[in-house]
Amino acid sequence: MLQLNKPLAFIDLETTGVNPGSDRIVEIAIIKVLPDGTKSVKRKLINPEVPIPQTASAVHGITNEMVKDAPTFKQVAHELRQMLDGSDLAGYNSNRFDIPLLMEEFLRVQVDFDMKGRRLVDVQNIFHKMEQRTLSAAYKFYCDKILEGAHGA
């Protein structure tokens, strides 16, 4: 059992591409686990305000049509920051992709998101020291289930 001293928020993003500096979030999923084991979940489609390339849609299945009426990141930034406040952050490849891209989105809309005092847990770094180095293998190892729909946040 995982012993937490403070909340741990697992983050997964689906995006318009793979460049944290220029691409945008089209879906965010957050699972926040409190030290007492209580969990809260937030999952949102986000209008990136730029076209989603076909190559990105082919990976995660999210289309321009699906996000046309979704809120923009600016519209949900304060809500997301509030959910993540006081939490350490975790994810798969999150230190190299999800967290930098999320930080860029907060900067773009001028919402302060302080990283001081946060621990970052990148499951990919942990898992790469072990067996196969894929999200599906990590999911099978940690959850003992077959991963379906890997590119839905």
Cite the ranges covered by each PLM segment.
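A short, structured active-site edge motif that brings together acidic residues
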Residues: 115-127
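Conserved non-catalytic scaffold segment of RNase H-like nuclease domains
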Residues: 1-117, 132-150
